[in-house]
Amino acid sequence: MIRVGIAGAAGYTAGELIRVLISHPQVELRYLQSESHRGESVGRVHRDLIYMNLKFSDLDLTDIDVLFLCMGHGMSAQFLERHPVPASVRIIDLSHDFRLKSNAGDFVYGLPELNRERIRGAWHVANPGCFATAIELGLLPLAKSGLPPAHVSVFGITGATGAGQKPTEETHYSHRAQNLSVYKVFSHQHLAEIREILAGQDEDVQADIAFVPVRGCHARGIMINAVFASERDLSEIRSMYAACYEGHPFTVMSDEPVYLKQVVNTNYCFVHVEQQDRNVLVTSVIDNLLKGASGQAVQNMNLMFGLEETAGLGLKASYF
């Protein structure tokens, strides 16, 4: 059994991670650390887990095989400075602290559809961001093709859980319900990793992306619509996408338009491509807390420990 510790275990991504791991056939949850809830029942914070006999506790880093860091951005690096982790313990970080090459050190970027083999041999993995996952999976086949578009316009809408557990004016029900709002236009923090990953596939790729993120009024799920011009015909583009994701169990090409409820509460990414004249539309949908965070973290753990990539991730979509 894989002995697991989670640091920062009280937030949304940690809650989803716990929910997935308690049903994982090869996992034993050893330590759930939360400085603000030390000694409390996990069910007092994650209210659907009141049936579990789990408590928040301090970590014993010598008694685990893998450490998940579910901490705020900037806090994972600080945690690792204060708490040296034994060399025998693998680390999966869900913050943005180690995603960019300038800060990565020996952390491997944890997008299995791109880095599956590197993840298999990794001891430290940086889990991608939620918007980054959806956009990269929507555009990666283009970057790999050698003929990427000169410019891509991306419109993305995300659920309220993408903002985290701490309430703010923008996440308050009276503001978010029955409302849409743009934010961080052309400057979202995930753009840096998106550009770096897409450009890394070909030295000629410029990764010119204009990204407009939108706060949705739903709880969870991301939809990305990417538009670009291409001289290729639709069948060629779809074939390119199918070839890129062949053998990757969680990224699925759809001939029909996709929608959020197909993937909410799952680790899947569904991708659909349409074309009219030279205009191409790529739509990708994911659950921001699963394929965009905790589910992908478990997928990476499975690869790191030589397990079936899908272990513990046979999750049911809500659908309706």
Predicted regions and their residues:
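Predominant activation on well-ordered alpha-helical scaffold segments within soluble catalytic domains
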Residues: 18, 136-143, 191-195, 242, ...
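C-terminal active-site/capping subdomain that shapes the small-molecule cofactor and substrate pocket
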Residues: 227-320
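C-terminal substrate-binding/catalytic lobe of Rossmann-fold NAD(P)-dependent dehydrogenases
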Residues: 187-253
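Short, solvent-exposed beta-strand edge segments and adjacent coil->beta transition regions
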Residues: 122-125, 180, 221-225, 281
